[in-house]
Protein backbone atom coordinates (compact mmCIF):
# COMPACT_ATOMS: atom_id res chain seq x y z
CA UNK A 1 0.00 0.00 0.00
CA UNK A 2 2.78 2.42 0.90
CA UNK A 3 4.43 1.62 -2.43
CA UNK A 4 1.17 2.35 -4.28
CA UNK A 5 0.77 5.65 -2.44
CA UNK A 6 4.34 6.66 -3.27
CA UNK A 7 3.80 5.73 -6.91
CA UNK A 8 0.66 7.88 -7.18
CA UNK A 9 2.51 10.79 -5.56
CA UNK A 10 5.15 10.41 -8.25
CA UNK A 11 2.62 10.27 -11.07
CA UNK A 12 0.93 13.46 -9.86
CA UNK A 13 4.30 15.16 -9.25
CA UNK A 14 3.34 16.25 -5.72
CA UNK A 15 6.61 15.37 -4.05
CA UNK A 16 7.76 12.26 -2.26
CA UNK A 17 5.33 10.34 -0.08
CA UNK A 18 5.94 10.76 3.64
CA UNK A 19 3.83 8.82 6.11
CA UNK A 20 3.74 11.63 8.68
CA UNK A 21 2.29 14.32 6.40
CA UNK A 22 0.87 12.75 3.23
CA UNK A 23 -2.73 13.17 4.40
CA UNK A 24 -2.30 16.95 4.53
CA UNK A 25 -0.89 16.93 1.00
CA UNK A 26 -3.84 14.93 -0.35
CA UNK A 27 -6.42 17.10 1.40
CA UNK A 28 -4.98 20.17 -0.33
CA UNK A 29 -5.34 18.63 -3.81
CA UNK A 30 -8.01 20.13 -6.06
CA UNK A 31 -9.65 18.04 -8.77
CA UNK A 32 -9.41 20.91 -11.27
CA UNK A 33 -5.61 20.92 -10.94
CA UNK A 34 -5.23 17.23 -11.78
CA UNK A 35 -4.39 16.33 -15.41
CA UNK A 36 -6.81 13.92 -17.08
CA UNK A 37 -4.23 11.12 -17.09
CA UNK A 38 -3.81 11.40 -13.32
CA UNK A 39 -7.45 11.31 -12.24
CA UNK A 40 -7.43 7.63 -11.29
CA UNK A 41 -4.46 8.33 -8.99
CA UNK A 42 -6.25 11.35 -7.53
CA UNK A 43 -9.31 9.20 -6.80
CA UNK A 44 -7.12 6.52 -5.24
CA UNK A 45 -5.38 9.01 -2.96
CA UNK A 46 -8.68 10.53 -1.87
CA UNK A 47 -10.09 7.08 -1.02
CA UNK A 48 -6.87 6.06 0.75
CA UNK A 49 -6.90 9.24 2.84
CA UNK A 50 -10.52 8.64 3.82
CA UNK A 51 -9.81 5.08 4.95
CA UNK A 52 -6.33 5.51 6.43
CA UNK A 53 -7.33 5.82 10.08
CA UNK A 54 -9.58 2.74 9.96
CA UNK A 55 -7.42 0.46 7.82
CA UNK A 56 -3.73 1.38 8.13
CA UNK A 57 -3.40 -0.61 11.35
CA UNK A 58 -4.33 -3.79 9.47
CA UNK A 59 -1.66 -3.47 6.75
CA UNK A 60 0.24 -6.74 6.46
CA UNK A 61 -2.54 -8.72 8.14
CA UNK A 62 -5.00 -11.32 6.87
CA UNK A 63 -8.63 -10.92 7.94
CA UNK A 64 -11.45 -13.46 7.87
CA UNK A 65 -14.89 -11.87 7.44
CA UNK A 66 -18.46 -12.92 6.65
CA UNK A 67 -20.26 -12.24 3.36
CA UNK A 68 -21.81 -9.00 4.61
CA UNK A 69 -18.45 -7.48 5.50
CA UNK A 70 -16.92 -8.91 2.34
CA UNK A 71 -19.38 -6.80 0.34
CA UNK A 72 -18.14 -3.67 2.09
CA UNK A 73 -14.52 -4.49 1.30
CA UNK A 74 -15.47 -4.76 -2.37
CA UNK A 75 -17.95 -1.91 -2.76
CA UNK A 76 -16.48 0.82 -0.54
CA UNK A 77 -13.40 2.22 -2.24
CA UNK A 78 -11.94 3.65 0.99
CA UNK A 79 -11.69 0.03 2.23
CA UNK A 80 -11.16 -1.79 -1.07
CA UNK A 81 -8.04 0.23 -1.91
CA UNK A 82 -6.29 -1.26 1.14
CA UNK A 83 -6.91 -4.86 0.09
CA UNK A 84 -4.12 -6.69 -1.74
CA UNK A 85 -6.31 -9.69 -2.57
CA UNK A 86 -9.41 -11.56 -1.47
CA UNK A 87 -10.03 -15.31 -1.38
CA UNK A 88 -13.79 -15.89 -1.51
CA UNK A 89 -15.01 -19.42 -0.80
CA UNK A 90 -18.34 -19.87 -2.55
CA UNK A 91 -20.08 -23.14 -3.31
CA UNK A 92 -21.66 -23.47 -6.76
CA UNK A 93 -21.58 -26.04 -9.61
CA UNK A 94 -18.55 -24.33 -11.15
CA UNK A 95 -16.39 -24.16 -8.03
CA UNK A 96 -17.44 -27.66 -6.98
CA UNK A 97 -15.61 -28.90 -10.10
CA UNK A 98 -12.43 -27.52 -8.56
CA UNK A 99 -12.42 -24.41 -10.76
CA UNK A 100 -10.89 -21.27 -9.22
CA UNK A 101 -12.07 -17.94 -10.63
CA UNK A 102 -9.60 -15.04 -10.50
CA UNK A 103 -10.77 -11.46 -11.08
CA UNK A 104 -7.73 -9.38 -11.99
CA UNK A 105 -7.46 -5.56 -11.83
CA UNK A 106 -8.92 -3.80 -14.85
CA UNK A 107 -6.60 -2.55 -17.57
CA UNK A 108 -7.17 1.06 -16.42
CA UNK A 109 -6.56 0.27 -12.74
CA UNK A 110 -3.58 1.87 -11.02
CA UNK A 111 -2.52 -1.71 -10.24
CA UNK A 112 -2.29 -2.56 -13.94
CA UNK A 113 1.34 -1.42 -13.84
CA UNK A 114 2.18 -4.69 -12.08
CA UNK A 115 2.73 -6.34 -15.46
CA UNK A 116 4.43 -9.42 -14.01
CA UNK A 117 1.39 -10.41 -11.94
CA UNK A 118 -0.94 -10.11 -14.92
CA UNK A 119 1.50 -12.06 -17.09
CA UNK A 120 1.57 -14.98 -14.65
CA UNK A 121 -2.21 -15.29 -14.89
CA UNK A 122 -2.02 -15.15 -18.69
CA UNK A 123 0.66 -17.81 -18.71
CA UNK A 124 -0.57 -20.23 -16.06
CA UNK A 125 -4.37 -20.04 -16.18
CA UNK A 126 -6.36 -22.76 -17.90
CA UNK A 127 -8.76 -20.22 -19.43
CA UNK A 128 -8.93 -16.44 -19.91
CA UNK A 129 -12.21 -14.54 -20.03
CA UNK A 130 -11.94 -10.93 -21.20
CA UNK A 131 -15.11 -8.94 -20.56
CA UNK A 132 -15.82 -5.71 -22.41
CA UNK A 133 -19.07 -3.78 -22.69
CA UNK A 134 -21.38 -2.99 -25.53
CA UNK A 135 -20.84 0.77 -25.36
CA UNK A 136 -17.21 0.68 -24.23
CA UNK A 137 -14.46 1.98 -26.51
CA UNK A 138 -11.08 0.33 -25.99
CA UNK A 139 -8.78 2.66 -24.06
CA UNK A 140 -5.02 2.78 -24.44
CA UNK A 141 -4.69 0.50 -21.40
CA UNK A 142 -7.19 -1.95 -22.94
CA UNK A 143 -5.23 -1.99 -26.18
CA UNK A 144 -1.96 -2.61 -24.35
CA UNK A 145 -3.49 -5.49 -22.41
CA UNK A 146 -4.95 -7.00 -25.58
CA UNK A 147 -1.63 -6.61 -27.36
CA UNK A 148 -0.02 -8.65 -24.59
CA UNK A 149 -2.67 -11.34 -25.06
CA UNK A 150 -1.82 -11.28 -28.75
CA UNK A 151 1.88 -11.73 -28.03
CA UNK A 152 1.39 -14.81 -25.87
CA UNK A 153 -1.59 -16.46 -27.58
CA UNK A 154 0.47 -18.55 -29.98
CA UNK A 155 2.52 -20.07 -27.17
CA UNK A 156 -0.37 -22.04 -25.70
CA UNK A 157 -1.34 -25.58 -26.65
CA UNK A 158 -5.03 -24.57 -26.74
CA UNK A 159 -6.88 -21.38 -27.58
CA UNK A 160 -7.92 -20.59 -24.03
CA UNK A 161 -9.12 -17.02 -24.62
CA UNK A 162 -12.80 -16.09 -24.60
CA UNK A 163 -14.00 -12.55 -25.29
CA UNK A 164 -17.37 -11.51 -23.91
CA UNK A 165 -19.25 -8.40 -25.07
CA UNK A 166 -21.61 -7.74 -22.18
CA UNK A 167 -24.80 -5.62 -22.15
CA UNK A 168 -25.74 -6.87 -25.61
CA UNK A 169 -29.36 -6.05 -24.76
CA UNK A 170 -28.51 -2.37 -25.38
CA UNK A 171 -28.41 -3.08 -29.13
CA UNK A 172 -31.43 -1.65 -30.92
CA UNK A 173 -31.29 -4.36 -33.59
CA UNK A 174 -29.44 -7.50 -34.58
CA UNK A 175 -27.67 -5.49 -37.29
CA UNK A 176 -26.36 -3.03 -34.72
CA UNK A 177 -25.17 -5.87 -32.48
CA UNK A 178 -23.42 -7.47 -35.44
CA UNK A 179 -21.61 -4.20 -36.18
CA UNK A 180 -20.42 -3.91 -32.58
CA UNK A 181 -19.15 -7.50 -32.55
CA UNK A 182 -17.42 -6.90 -35.89
CA UNK A 183 -15.72 -3.82 -34.42
CA UNK A 184 -14.52 -5.81 -31.39
CA UNK A 185 -13.29 -8.56 -33.72
CA UNK A 186 -11.34 -6.01 -35.78
CA UNK A 187 -9.81 -4.46 -32.65
CA UNK A 188 -8.72 -7.87 -31.36
CA UNK A 189 -7.15 -8.81 -34.68
CA UNK A 190 -5.34 -5.47 -34.76
CA UNK A 191 -3.91 -6.38 -31.35
CA UNK A 192 -2.55 -9.61 -32.83
CA UNK A 193 -5.29 -11.96 -31.62
CA UNK A 194 -6.17 -14.10 -34.61
CA UNK A 195 -9.54 -15.88 -34.83
CA UNK A 196 -10.87 -14.51 -31.52
CA UNK A 197 -13.80 -16.29 -29.87
CA UNK A 198 -16.35 -13.52 -29.24
CA UNK A 199 -19.66 -13.97 -27.44
CA UNK A 200 -22.20 -11.13 -27.08
CA UNK A 201 -24.25 -11.65 -23.92
CA UNK A 202 -26.65 -9.84 -21.65
CA UNK A 203 -25.64 -10.87 -18.15
CA UNK A 204 -28.64 -9.01 -16.69
CA UNK A 205 -31.14 -10.85 -18.87
CA UNK A 206 -29.29 -14.13 -18.33
CA UNK A 207 -29.46 -13.75 -14.55
CA UNK A 208 -33.17 -12.95 -14.66
CA UNK A 209 -33.79 -15.93 -16.95
CA UNK A 210 -31.77 -18.22 -14.68
CA UNK A 211 -33.71 -17.15 -11.60
CA UNK A 212 -37.01 -17.60 -13.43
CA UNK A 213 -36.01 -20.93 -14.98
CA UNK A 214 -36.76 -19.49 -18.43
CA UNK A 215 -34.59 -21.48 -20.88
CA UNK A 216 -35.89 -19.55 -23.91
CA UNK A 217 -34.89 -16.16 -22.47
CA UNK A 218 -31.57 -17.62 -21.35
CA UNK A 219 -30.88 -18.64 -24.94
CA UNK A 220 -31.84 -15.19 -26.25
CA UNK A 221 -29.46 -13.57 -23.73
CA UNK A 222 -26.51 -15.21 -25.49
CA UNK A 223 -25.22 -16.65 -22.24
CA UNK A 224 -26.39 -20.20 -22.98
CA UNK A 225 -24.24 -20.34 -26.13
CA UNK A 226 -21.16 -19.09 -24.30
CA UNK A 227 -21.77 -21.46 -21.38
CA UNK A 228 -22.09 -24.40 -23.76
CA UNK A 229 -18.81 -23.59 -25.54
CA UNK A 230 -17.00 -22.91 -22.27
CA UNK A 231 -18.27 -26.13 -20.69
CA UNK A 232 -17.08 -28.03 -23.76
CA UNK A 233 -13.66 -26.39 -23.47
CA UNK A 234 -13.36 -27.34 -19.79
CA UNK A 235 -14.88 -30.80 -20.14
CA UNK A 236 -13.40 -31.83 -23.48
CA UNK A 237 -10.44 -29.73 -24.63
CA UNK A 238 -8.67 -29.39 -21.28
CA UNK A 239 -9.66 -32.90 -20.27
CA UNK A 240 -8.39 -34.12 -23.62
CA UNK A 241 -4.92 -32.75 -22.89
CA UNK A 242 -4.90 -34.46 -19.50
CA UNK A 243 -6.22 -37.68 -21.05
CA UNK A 244 -3.52 -37.66 -23.74
CA UNK A 245 -0.82 -37.20 -21.10
CA UNK A 246 -2.29 -40.00 -18.99
CA UNK A 247 -2.51 -42.25 -22.06
CA UNK A 248 1.19 -41.69 -22.77
CA UNK A 249 2.05 -42.70 -19.21
CA UNK A 250 -0.11 -45.82 -19.47
CA UNK A 251 1.60 -46.73 -22.74
CA UNK A 252 5.01 -46.56 -21.09
CA UNK A 253 3.74 -48.76 -18.25
CA UNK A 254 2.39 -51.20 -20.83
CA UNK A 255 5.78 -51.41 -22.56
CA UNK A 256 7.46 -52.18 -19.24
CA UNK A 257 4.92 -54.90 -18.47
CA UNK A 258 5.48 -56.41 -21.92
CA UNK A 259 9.22 -56.29 -21.40
CA UNK A 260 8.86 -58.09 -18.07
CA UNK A 261 6.61 -60.73 -19.64
CA UNK A 262 9.25 -61.26 -22.32
CA UNK A 263 11.93 -61.71 -19.65
CA UNK A 264 9.74 -64.18 -17.75
CA UNK A 265 9.35 -66.27 -20.88
CA UNK A 266 13.11 -66.78 -21.04
CA UNK A 267 14.94 -69.62 -19.39
CA UNK A 268 17.15 -69.00 -16.39
CA UNK A 269 20.24 -69.36 -18.60
CA UNK A 270 18.91 -66.83 -21.11
CA UNK A 271 18.17 -64.33 -18.34
CA UNK A 272 21.65 -64.80 -16.90
CA UNK A 273 23.17 -64.15 -20.33
CA UNK A 274 21.00 -61.02 -20.64
CA UNK A 275 22.22 -59.73 -17.26
CA UNK A 276 25.84 -60.32 -18.34
CA UNK A 277 25.18 -58.29 -21.49
CA UNK A 278 23.64 -55.57 -19.33
CA UNK A 279 26.80 -55.36 -17.26
CA UNK A 280 28.85 -55.08 -20.44
CA UNK A 281 26.58 -52.39 -21.92
CA UNK A 282 26.11 -50.35 -18.75
CA UNK A 283 29.36 -48.47 -19.32
CA UNK A 284 28.54 -47.38 -22.86
CA UNK A 285 25.04 -46.40 -21.74
CA UNK A 286 26.49 -44.22 -18.98
CA UNK A 287 28.95 -42.66 -21.44
CA UNK A 288 26.13 -41.73 -23.76
CA UNK A 289 24.34 -40.05 -20.84
CA UNK A 290 27.49 -38.06 -20.08
CA UNK A 291 27.39 -36.82 -23.68
CA UNK A 292 23.73 -35.87 -23.31
CA UNK A 293 24.43 -33.98 -20.09
CA UNK A 294 27.34 -32.17 -21.72
CA UNK A 295 25.42 -30.95 -24.76
CA UNK A 296 25.99 -27.20 -25.09
CA UNK A 297 22.82 -25.40 -26.16
CA UNK A 298 24.05 -21.96 -25.10
CA UNK A 299 25.07 -20.69 -28.58
CA UNK A 300 21.56 -21.27 -29.93
CA UNK A 301 19.94 -19.78 -26.83
CA UNK A 302 22.16 -16.70 -26.83
CA UNK A 303 21.52 -16.14 -30.54
CA UNK A 304 17.76 -16.56 -30.13
CA UNK A 305 17.70 -14.20 -27.15
CA UNK A 306 19.68 -11.57 -29.02
CA UNK A 307 17.38 -11.69 -32.03
CA UNK A 308 14.23 -11.51 -29.90
CA UNK A 309 15.48 -8.60 -27.79
CA UNK A 310 16.64 -6.74 -30.92
CA UNK A 311 13.10 -6.88 -32.27
CA UNK A 312 11.77 -5.79 -28.86
CA UNK A 313 13.88 -2.64 -29.11
CA UNK A 314 12.53 -1.93 -32.59
CA UNK A 315 8.92 -2.31 -31.46
CA UNK A 316 9.48 -0.17 -28.37
CA UNK A 317 10.98 2.55 -30.55
CA UNK A 318 7.85 2.57 -32.70
CA UNK A 319 5.62 2.49 -29.62
CA UNK A 320 7.44 5.51 -28.19
CA UNK A 321 6.25 7.62 -31.13
CA UNK A 322 2.60 6.62 -30.74
CA UNK A 323 2.68 7.11 -26.98
CA UNK A 324 4.41 10.47 -27.35
CA UNK A 325 1.55 11.76 -29.50
CA UNK A 326 -0.92 10.52 -26.90
CA UNK A 327 0.70 11.99 -23.80
CA UNK A 328 1.87 15.24 -25.37
CA UNK A 329 -1.60 16.01 -26.67
CA UNK A 330 -3.50 19.32 -26.73
CA UNK A 331 -6.22 17.86 -24.50
CA UNK A 332 -3.65 17.29 -21.72
CA UNK A 333 -1.62 20.49 -22.05
CA UNK A 334 -4.18 23.30 -22.08
CA UNK A 335 -4.01 26.76 -20.53
CA UNK A 336 -7.09 26.33 -18.37
CA UNK A 337 -5.82 27.81 -15.13
CA UNK A 338 -3.90 24.76 -13.97
CA UNK A 339 -0.18 24.55 -13.28
CA UNK A 340 1.31 24.12 -16.76
CA UNK A 341 4.68 22.98 -15.45
CA UNK A 342 3.00 20.22 -13.46
CA UNK A 343 0.99 19.16 -16.50
CA UNK A 344 4.16 19.01 -18.58
CA UNK A 345 5.94 17.01 -15.87
CA UNK A 346 3.01 14.57 -15.62
CA UNK A 347 2.93 14.14 -19.42
CA UNK A 348 6.64 13.31 -19.49
CA UNK A 349 6.30 10.95 -16.52
CA UNK A 350 3.25 9.18 -17.98
CA UNK A 351 4.92 8.83 -21.38
CA UNK A 352 7.93 7.12 -19.83
CA UNK A 353 5.74 5.06 -17.51
CA UNK A 354 3.63 3.87 -20.45
CA UNK A 355 6.73 3.09 -22.48
CA UNK A 356 8.25 1.27 -19.51
CA UNK A 357 5.14 -0.91 -19.28
CA UNK A 358 5.37 -1.62 -23.00
CA UNK A 359 9.00 -2.68 -22.65
CA UNK A 360 8.21 -4.88 -19.65
CA UNK A 361 5.32 -6.60 -21.44
CA UNK A 362 7.50 -7.21 -24.50
CA UNK A 363 10.27 -8.72 -22.38
CA UNK A 364 7.84 -10.95 -20.48
CA UNK A 365 6.44 -12.21 -23.77
CA UNK A 366 10.02 -12.80 -24.89
CA UNK A 367 10.61 -14.96 -21.81
CA UNK A 368 7.66 -17.15 -22.85
CA UNK A 369 9.04 -17.50 -26.39
CA UNK A 370 12.40 -18.49 -24.94
CA UNK A 371 10.72 -21.09 -22.73
CA UNK A 372 9.22 -22.70 -25.81
CA UNK A 373 12.53 -22.48 -27.67
CA UNK A 374 14.57 -24.08 -24.88
CA UNK A 375 11.90 -26.70 -24.29
CA UNK A 376 12.09 -27.59 -27.99
CA UNK A 377 15.90 -27.73 -27.86
CA UNK A 378 15.86 -30.08 -24.86
CA UNK A 379 13.28 -32.31 -26.53
CA UNK A 380 15.33 -32.29 -29.74
CA UNK A 381 18.50 -33.43 -27.99
CA UNK A 382 16.64 -36.05 -25.97
CA UNK A 383 15.01 -37.30 -29.17
CA UNK A 384 18.38 -37.55 -30.93
CA UNK A 385 19.83 -39.44 -27.97
CA UNK A 386 16.82 -41.75 -27.93
CA UNK A 387 17.13 -42.45 -31.65
CA UNK A 388 20.80 -43.34 -31.19
CA UNK A 389 20.10 -45.67 -28.27
CA UNK A 390 16.98 -47.33 -29.67
CA UNK A 391 19.02 -49.31 -32.19
CA UNK A 392 21.26 -50.80 -29.51
CA UNK A 393 20.60 -53.93 -27.43
CA UNK A 394 19.87 -54.60 -24.69
CA UNK A 395 18.02 -51.46 -23.63
CA UNK A 396 15.12 -50.71 -21.28
CA UNK A 397 11.87 -49.25 -22.60
CA UNK A 398 12.97 -45.64 -23.20
CA UNK A 399 10.81 -42.55 -23.60
CA UNK A 400 11.26 -38.78 -23.38
CA UNK A 401 9.70 -37.20 -20.30
CA UNK A 402 8.25 -33.71 -20.18
CA UNK A 403 10.59 -31.11 -18.70
CA UNK A 404 9.18 -30.04 -15.34
CA UNK A 405 8.03 -26.47 -14.83
CA UNK A 406 9.22 -23.09 -16.00
CA UNK A 407 9.55 -20.18 -13.61
CA UNK A 408 9.56 -16.74 -15.25
CA UNK A 409 12.80 -14.83 -14.62
CA UNK A 410 12.48 -11.51 -12.80
CA UNK A 411 12.08 -8.68 -15.32
CA UNK A 412 11.29 -5.89 -12.89
CA UNK A 413 8.93 -2.92 -13.06
CA UNK A 414 9.48 0.74 -13.84
CA UNK A 415 12.46 -0.02 -16.08
CA UNK A 416 12.29 3.41 -17.71
CA UNK A 417 10.13 5.36 -15.25
CA UNK A 418 11.73 8.52 -13.83
CA UNK A 419 14.69 8.46 -16.20
CA UNK A 420 13.99 11.99 -17.53
CA UNK A 421 13.89 15.17 -15.44
CA UNK A 422 11.13 17.39 -16.83
CA UNK A 423 13.09 20.55 -15.91
CA UNK A 424 15.75 19.63 -18.48
CA UNK A 425 13.14 19.84 -21.26
CA UNK A 426 10.75 22.54 -20.07
CA UNK A 427 12.38 25.07 -22.39
CA UNK A 428 10.81 23.30 -25.39
CA UNK A 429 7.36 24.24 -24.11
CA UNK A 430 6.90 28.00 -24.44
CA UNK A 431 3.11 27.80 -24.63
CA UNK A 432 0.49 25.40 -26.05
CA UNK A 433 0.14 27.30 -29.34
CA UNK A 434 3.87 27.26 -30.07
CA UNK A 435 4.20 23.67 -28.90
CA UNK A 436 1.37 22.17 -30.93
CA UNK A 437 1.04 24.50 -33.90
CA UNK A 438 4.70 25.37 -34.19
CA UNK A 439 7.83 23.25 -33.92
CA UNK A 440 7.89 22.70 -30.15
CA UNK A 441 6.41 19.22 -29.97
CA UNK A 442 8.56 17.82 -32.77
CA UNK A 443 11.69 19.50 -31.39
CA UNK A 444 11.06 17.95 -27.97
CA UNK A 445 10.52 14.52 -29.50
CA UNK A 446 13.82 14.78 -31.37
CA UNK A 447 15.61 15.93 -28.21
CA UNK A 448 14.26 12.94 -26.30
CA UNK A 449 14.87 10.37 -29.07
CA UNK A 450 18.62 9.80 -28.70
CA UNK A 451 18.78 9.55 -24.89
CA UNK A 452 15.68 7.35 -24.96
CA UNK A 453 17.33 4.97 -27.43
CA UNK A 454 20.36 4.79 -25.14
CA UNK A 455 18.15 4.06 -22.13
CA UNK A 456 16.19 1.34 -23.93
CA UNK A 457 19.40 -0.22 -25.21
CA UNK A 458 20.98 -0.19 -21.75
CA UNK A 459 17.93 -1.83 -20.16
CA UNK A 460 17.43 -4.27 -23.04
CA UNK A 461 21.09 -5.32 -22.99
CA UNK A 462 20.92 -5.92 -19.25
CA UNK A 463 17.72 -7.96 -19.50
CA UNK A 464 19.12 -9.82 -22.52
CA UNK A 465 22.07 -10.93 -20.40
CA UNK A 466 19.69 -11.98 -17.62
CA UNK A 467 17.50 -13.97 -20.00
CA UNK A 468 20.44 -15.61 -21.77
CA UNK A 469 22.04 -16.66 -18.50
CA UNK A 470 18.75 -17.88 -17.03
CA UNK A 471 17.71 -20.02 -20.00
CA UNK A 472 21.21 -21.39 -20.57
CA UNK A 473 21.12 -22.58 -16.95
CA UNK A 474 17.61 -23.95 -17.46
CA UNK A 475 18.82 -25.87 -20.51
CA UNK A 476 21.60 -27.44 -18.44
CA UNK A 477 19.06 -28.33 -15.77
CA UNK A 478 16.67 -29.75 -18.36
CA UNK A 479 19.31 -31.98 -19.95
CA UNK A 480 20.45 -33.11 -16.50
CA UNK A 481 16.87 -33.93 -15.57
CA UNK A 482 16.38 -35.85 -18.82
CA UNK A 483 19.62 -37.80 -18.36
CA UNK A 484 18.65 -38.64 -14.77
CA UNK A 485 15.34 -39.94 -16.10
CA UNK A 486 17.04 -42.20 -18.66
CA UNK A 487 19.48 -43.41 -16.01
CA UNK A 488 16.64 -44.26 -13.65
CA UNK A 489 14.91 -46.28 -16.38
CA UNK A 490 18.05 -48.40 -16.73
CA UNK A 491 18.41 -48.90 -12.95
CA UNK A 492 14.79 -49.97 -12.53
CA UNK A 493 14.98 -52.31 -15.52
CA UNK A 494 18.17 -53.99 -14.30
CA UNK A 495 16.74 -54.40 -10.80
CA UNK A 496 13.64 -56.02 -12.28
CA UNK A 497 15.67 -58.48 -14.34
CA UNK A 498 17.81 -59.47 -11.38
CA UNK A 499 14.76 -59.92 -9.20
CA UNK A 500 12.72 -62.04 -11.59
CA UNK A 501 11.69 -65.45 -10.33
CA UNK A 502 9.90 -67.36 -13.08
CA UNK A 503 6.29 -67.97 -12.05
CA UNK A 504 3.31 -68.95 -14.11
CA UNK A 505 1.06 -67.03 -11.75
CA UNK A 506 3.05 -63.83 -12.23
CA UNK A 507 3.03 -64.21 -16.00
CA UNK A 508 -0.74 -64.64 -16.05
CA UNK A 509 -1.15 -61.65 -13.74
CA UNK A 510 1.09 -59.48 -15.94
CA UNK A 511 -0.76 -60.54 -19.10
CA UNK A 512 -4.05 -59.54 -17.47
CA UNK A 513 -2.50 -56.25 -16.28
CA UNK A 514 -1.17 -55.54 -19.76
CA UNK A 515 -4.62 -56.11 -21.23
CA UNK A 516 -6.19 -53.68 -18.76
CA UNK A 517 -3.50 -51.08 -19.45
CA UNK A 518 -4.04 -51.39 -23.20
CA UNK A 519 -7.80 -51.01 -22.80
CA UNK A 520 -7.43 -47.98 -20.52
CA UNK A 521 -4.97 -46.38 -22.92
CA UNK A 522 -7.38 -46.87 -25.81
CA UNK A 523 -10.21 -45.29 -23.83
CA UNK A 524 -8.08 -42.27 -22.97
CA UNK A 525 -7.00 -41.91 -26.61
CA UNK A 526 -10.65 -41.76 -27.60
CA UNK A 527 -11.26 -38.99 -25.06
CA UNK A 528 -8.26 -37.00 -26.24
Where are these regions (language model features)?
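Short, flexible/disordered intra-domain loops and linkers
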Residues: 173-178, 212-216
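Catalytic micro-motifs at enzyme active sites that drive phosphoryl/nucleotidyl and oxygen chemistry
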Residues: 89-90, 117-118, 150-152, 188
Amino acid sequence: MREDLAYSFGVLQIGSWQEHNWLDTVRKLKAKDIPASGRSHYSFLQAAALGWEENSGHLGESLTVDMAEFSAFVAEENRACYVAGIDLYYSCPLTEQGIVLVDTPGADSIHARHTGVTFQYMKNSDALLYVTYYNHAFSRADKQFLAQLGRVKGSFALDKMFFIVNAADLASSSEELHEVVAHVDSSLRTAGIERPQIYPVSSLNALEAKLAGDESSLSVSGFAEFASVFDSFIGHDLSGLAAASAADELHQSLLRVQQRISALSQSGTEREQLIQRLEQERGSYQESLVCLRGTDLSPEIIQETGELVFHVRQRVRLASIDLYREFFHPSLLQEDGGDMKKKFAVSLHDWMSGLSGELERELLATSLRLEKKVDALISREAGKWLEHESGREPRPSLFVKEFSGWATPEIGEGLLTGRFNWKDYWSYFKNPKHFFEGSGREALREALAAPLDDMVKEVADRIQETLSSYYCNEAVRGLEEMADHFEQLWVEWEEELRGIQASGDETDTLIALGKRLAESEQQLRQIS
